[in-house]
Structures are given as C-alpha cells and as structure tokens.
Amino acid sequence: MLRAGAPTAGSFRTEEVHTGTTIMAVEFDGGVVVGSDSRVSAGTAVVNRVFDKLSPLHQRIFCALSGSAADAQAIADMAAYQLELHGLELEEPPLVLAAANVVKNISYKYREDLLAHLIVAGWDQREGGQVYGTMGGMLIRQPFTIGGSGSSYIYGYVDAAYKPGMTPEECRRFTTNAITLAMNRDGSSGGVIYLVTITAAGVDHRVILGDELPRFYDE
C-alpha cells in the first residue's frame, strides 16, 4: 500500500479488516447493558459504517467484538456453537460464566493466530447480570469494562462517571456518553451506537443514530 499520495484502486485490498472500535458493558441489578460503535476499517478506508459488533452467543448472552473483524467473529461463532451444544446437553441455558470460559479458552488456544478481544456479558438465573473481560485468554468479572482502540480515550471518564446501583436507563446513558466521547477522538471508531439490554425478561435492542448522539463541548 502506498504511504504517500492519493490511494489507488485496489490499494486497500491487502489491508486486514479491523473493528478498530469502542466496546463497553455495564452491570446493573438484574441485568447488563452492552454497547459498541459501528465503524469497520481496512487501513485508512472505512469499509462498513453500520456493522453490529454485538454478537449473540446464546439467548441472554452477548459478546462485544474488537480487533480483526474476521478473527473476532470466528471466536464468537465457535463459542456460540459450543454453547448451543452445551445447552442441549444440560437441557437448560448455559451460565454466563460458562460462556465467558468458552471464549477465554478459544482466545488463549489461538492467541498466536487470532487478533481479537471480546467482552462477554449476559444474564442467568444463578448470578443475574454479569460482565467478563477475556483479553489474551484471561477471565475477570467486573462491574463494567471497556475495550477497543477508542477505550484509551475514555478511561478517565468511565472511572469518574460510574457509580454502583445505576438503573438500566442510567447504564444506557453512561454507555452512550462514553462511546460517543471515544468516537469523537478515535479515528477508528464512529457511525452509530448499538445498545443491548439483557434481563430476565429478555433482550432489548436499540440503535442510537448519529443525529441522536449526545453533544459535548469539543463539538
């Protein structure tokens, strides 16, 4: 790929497609909120402006994708397949912790081959809402977590703005504000915001369009 001058036809063909991104998940009493931006890039080209990076692993378990788009989706697909079999064997929905362990094991096994970071979040009858980070094959439960290239811009904001005991609507607002701030500063994040709220009652999907995003001082 040329480093100077105007890009030529086909100059992006050898660039790996990345969900250079901002992903986030937050626990609340009775469920979780998972959110992401929607931009996918290959080199300096934006190849998809509205890609949904929130992938279902089971009925009430989702993962948020970042890293190489193909690698992240491959991990999600493998995990979803294993969890489907696991649920059939148990004759009940798998636990969120089990889903996180599946993702962790796949990520660690193929750590030399796959470039991806997945956040696993969901609800089950045993522990309620849960959020797990799985970067590099680790597994840690957190009240909230962020990931992707845009996350480096918002650590200070999320640390200051998070408070225990938030309502679902407060969690959605917290997630929307954080991802919007990251999108304003990270060239690899952008587009719309996808939000998924998972509770015992089911899964609620929302899309925050560009003209509906909150506005901040720098704009």
UniProtKB/Swiss-Prot annotation:
InterPro entries: Ntn_hydrolases_N, Pept_T1A_subB, Proteasome_bsu_CS, Proteasome_sua/b, Proteasome_suB-type. Keywords: Acetylation, Cytoplasm, Hydrolase, Immunity, Nucleus, Protease, Proteasome, Threonine protease, Zymogen. Residues 1-20 form a propeptide. The active site is at T21. Autocleaved. The resulting N-terminal Thr residue of the mature subunit is responsible for the nucleophile proteolytic activity. Its EC number is 3.4.25.1. This is Proteasome subunit beta type-9. The record marks G20, T21 as: Cleavage. One of its GO terms (molecular function) is threonine-type endopeptidase activity.
